[in-house]
Amino acid sequence: MFSRNHRSRVTVARGSALEMEFKRGRFRLSLFSDLPEDTELQRKLDHEIRMREGACKLLAACSQREQALEATKSLLVCNSRILSYMGELQRRKEAQVLGKTSRRPSDSGPPAERSPCRGRVCISDLRIPLMWKDTEYFKNKGDLHRWAVFLLLQLGEHIQDTEMILVDRTLTDISFQSNVLFAEAGPDFELRLELYGACVEEEGALTGGPKRLATKLSSSLGRSSGRRVRASLDSAGGSGSSPILLPTPVVGGPRYHLLAHTTLTLAAVQDGFRTHDLTLASHEENPAWLPLYGSVCCRLAAQPLCMTQPTASGTLRVQQAGEMQNWAQVHGVLKGTNLFCYRQPEDADTGEEPLLTIAVNKETRVRAGELDQALGRPFTLSISNQYGDDEVTHTLQTESREALQSWMEALWQLFFDMSQWKQCCDEIMKIETPAPRKPPQALAKQGSLYHEMAIEPLDDIAAVTDILTQREGARLETPPPWLAMFTDQPALPNPCSPASVAPAPDWTHPLPWGRPRTFSLDAVPPDHSPRARSVAPLPPQRSPRTRGLCSKGQPRTWLQSPV
């Protein structure tokens, strides 16, 4: 039998040795209760479990390949986060039990070791070059094989991912535009990068098999026959029945494969672009295999908190240069590699220029000393820096011994952080805040442009006239005089349009586009009836040259049927 403490979420067996220790008073049940950080981790774990359930339902309801790829990617990320959170939660529980039960409260152990500050780590400008073969990149003129790839990044128990990228042989590298930021990292961090990929045209794909076969048939049988076969296949697939030549494909979710991975540490941090080696984890027989070059290019930056946030502040007295008895009272702020001295505490918040700036770097020497106590200022702090052959020393005074100890502790902690974060404390590296993730773009149609073009018989003389006038490119500022014959029509062509300046064709030769359209006797409009023509005013007298222009005018206006 078990008794559960619902408040602390601890299960203790009745009659067990642990319960006997509780009764004897050696242990307290609160030692095994959840800490605030453990509660937050448990909340994240519950959230990812719900996200995984939603991803499974979404994957089962997907009807398009791109939707299935995104759902499978979300499912893989959720599973990775769940495993990471469970492992971290178990590790914290074990450390909590071992740390609090290994020694009794009366035991006096060694003081706690100094720990470095935390920081932020950001990776951006991720590029993975590809190495295509000549037969695949230059000589392959068939259908494009496509892959869907993304990066999974893990730092400690935190896992993030990039957007999904579609890759084919037209790309020379895989470029990820998003910046990935980890807000909680130590100087001993290990950032693991994993590249996952899935073939878009994988066997068992949701769509695409019958269409690819129809494309091949249309190209092999010819334009007319192939178009009829392709139309029959499309109609069969759209009506819900099975295609004529292929059975219904088996619906199954895509599968991502691990293609390559690498691990980046503090040594890889640099305020610039850098290349790192990749460990390939896939072979050429894998359907998701990509010709990776074996390296990844990125910018890895880090910002320790000691470089971006103040570590100590308080009232100080600074000795003026060359004056032993003249001390100026300032407000000191230790931030990054500088000790800023302001006239007033408000100046630090408003961004005013400091009165004095004292450098504090890895080469700085700090010494605490005491002057004559009769002067009333016994607690001093000396900061020395070497500038070439000269040594500059600034002497500071604190108000009490506790304030002096506080400043010394802050300075020693800063020196320890510099020794752990190394090159990250030379200067502040720029880190951009990641932009919100954009929704995934729909997959673009791929295939031959020849089969995607709708080629119809060119029996419309208006379409041919537009093509000819676009090639000529000439324009008329005013409409031609023969356009007055067609003023009774409801829609007139624009005189500035390219169609009004088409060259006059020679009607003595057969037309290359076939027989033009003619007027139908059954479809004469009311304004073109014989009665309307009998009362219409006669056109003005024209010269023979003008009459020639009327007879050889724009074919679009006098040959096109108004029906």
Curated annotation (Swiss-Prot):
Domain annotation PH: ranges: 309-416
Cited InterPro entries = AHD (IPR012966), Cytokinesis/Rho-signaling (IPR051364), HR1_rho-bd (IPR011072), PH-like_dom_sf (IPR011993), PH_domain (IPR001849)
Please give the tissue specificity annotation from the record for this chain: Highly expressed in prostate, moderately in kidney, heart, brain, spleen, testis, placenta, small intestine, pancreas, skeletal muscle and peripheral blood leukocytes, and weakly in ovary, colon and thymus. Weakly expressed in all normal cell lines tested. Overexpressed in various cancer cell lines.
Q: Which residues carry this modification: Asymmetric dimethylarginine?
A: R230
Q: Which GO terms describe its molecular function?
A: GTP binding; GTPase inhibitor activity; small GTPase binding
Question: Which SUPFAM superfamilies does the entry mention?
Answer: PH domain-like (SSF50729)
- REM-1 domain residues are 17-98
Cellular component terms, GO, for this chain's entry? actomyosin contractile ring; cytosol
UniProt-listed Gene3D superfamilies: Pleckstrin-homology domain (PH domain)/Phosphotyrosine-binding domain (PTB)
Function of this protein?
Mediates Rho signaling to activate NF-kappa-B and may confer increased resistance to apoptosis to cells in gastric tumorigenesis. May play a novel role in the organization of septin structures.
What's the protein name? Rhotekin
Origin organism is Homo sapiens (Human)
Gene that this sequence comes from:
RTKN
